[in-house]
């Protein structure tokens, strides 16, 4: 393995661990929506400062960033509710796995992507893993996780378009800014201003660290895809579903260690086949 590919491998695996870590923090939070709000708000402020410092290019196409921020709001609401309802080792793998699959289907429908026979096999395998995970979950819990996955797919498609028509780095920064804005607006309209202010005063450091972790996860993936094929990086990145299955069953004491880890591995295998078929 060359030094460049090794660097990409380490970056992608680190991103997987970091993404699983901040989701674990959200799951363990007393008020999960508030935790996600604080995380996205601090990331959004940081993103805006950096974007202004480096300069927003003339002719920047704003609508994808705004649309992505709005979709991320619904993703955050759905994710918080799903973590309230279901186990970590069920919600996360179903949401991430279904999100990747729906994004692949959406790419065919809306972005002129094409599915090869191997990609179809990968989708079938991943769907099988998701069915195994959902089979022993309450219907409401499984549907909530699938709802999260639909928003993952939706913002992934919008961001794919947005990164193609804009500078990818500045666009990524402004996604966080738009998400923080819409999430804050939602909280204010829901009458949670006092809770938000109190939480920011007492937990600003944790919010900032979680926000930095969220942003850093994205940047690690961006750096990795410059050094290795996108499919290779994506497959490693989605290894987080196995990490979460292990953490949920071993660290959080959730039931079904072998079944959930096995099903998560099947989801990961399907995603690996999917990206290998590109």
Task: Please give the residue ranges for each predicted region.
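Structural motif at transmembrane-helix junctions in multi-pass transporters
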Residues: 30-35, 78-96, 111-114, 164-171, ...
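Hydrophobic/aromatic positions within or immediately flanking transmembrane alpha-helices
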Residues: 12, 36-37, 65, 92-93, ...
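Hydrophobic transmembrane alpha-helices of multi-pass small-molecule transport proteins
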Residues: 44-47, 101-108, 115-135, 259-278
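Membrane-interface interhelical linkers
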Residues: 1-70, 74-88, 135-146, 177-227, ...
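Selected transmembrane alpha-helices and immediately adjacent juxtamembrane segments
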Residues: 140-172
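Residue positions within transmembrane alpha-helices of multi-pass solute transporters
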Residues: 17, 21, 74, 98-102, ...
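N-terminal hydrophobic targeting segments
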Residues: 64-127
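Alpha-helical transmembrane segments of compact multi-pass small-molecule transporters, enriched
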Residues: 41-46, 94-109, 121-124, 178-182, ...
